[in-house]
Amino acid sequence: LDRANSMYQRDKNHAAILIWSCGNESFGGKDIFEMSQFFRNTDPTRLVHYEGVCHDRRYNATSDMESQMYPSVEAIKDFLAKDDSKPFICCEYTHAMGNSCGAMHKYTDLTGTEPKYQGGFIWDYIDQSIYKKDRYGKEFQAYGGDFGERPTDYNFSGNGIAYGGNRDASPKMQEVKFNYQNITAQVKEETVKVINKNLFVNTNIFDCKATLQKDGKVVRTAVMETAVEPLSQKEYALPFKKEEKAGEYTVTVSFHLKEDKPWAKAGHEVAFGQYV
């Protein structure tokens, strides 16, 4: 309780704090339940989270949400079919170590079919590595064991969607960005269905561009005007005719910022869809 109070007093005035956590990977029990009650009694405006109750149901009321680590999509479906009394989140999922995040779409697609599934939190955001120079003076991203320490977990700290050091996006970031985009462009031979999953903004606040490529080379581009209201969809004709000459053709419909934002410059791509 003293630890819970210390965290509460430190963070209570931060607007970014939405949920209080009772800890991590610590099973369950009365003391942790009392922590959750402290948060509720002291701050009824925020939710309380604890994953450990999925291993110890004696104090199921500890957490305001069902929280599990790395469940399969089928396991989530099976659980919600039996008990949907709480919203379900993955407090950790799609472990971003090495060449990973490839099946992430199975989880993001689930949000469209399971109303109680609330998504998850990727483990984790940035590689926990630091710059070190090799014997030739060249810098590299060092991890466990690179400093002669033993025992060590070696590269297990390198599991982010962004690289350590300068925070460059890793290839995994592209997969994450696509699955999290708030506009879906379902492109076919002659049409594109634009699904606007944004809660508040129309797609007309973005520039929409269609690009036709043959064998990887741009053949033509065109500007498209879209105006899809939040949480709705609309189908548009593509500005290209169907090509007859042999080759591999791709049609990409993308959405871009019209003006600079605090987080990205004008022209930044926020969503795309492609047909081959």
State where each predicted segment sits.
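Generic detector of intrinsically disordered, low-complexity, polar/charged segments
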Residues: Q141-G145, S157, E244, A264, ...
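A short, hydrophobic secondary-structure junction motif
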Residues: T94-H95, F255, Q274-V276
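A generic structural signal for beta-strand entry/edge sites
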Residues: E189-T191, E248
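Extended substrate-binding grooves/exosites of carbohydrate-active enzymes
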Residues: L1-E189, N198-N204, K209-V218
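Intrinsically disordered, low-complexity Pro/Gly/Ser/Thr-rich segments with frequent PxxP/GP/PP motifs
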Residues: F206-C208, Q213-A246, T252-K258, W263
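Short beta-strand elements
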Residues: D260-V276
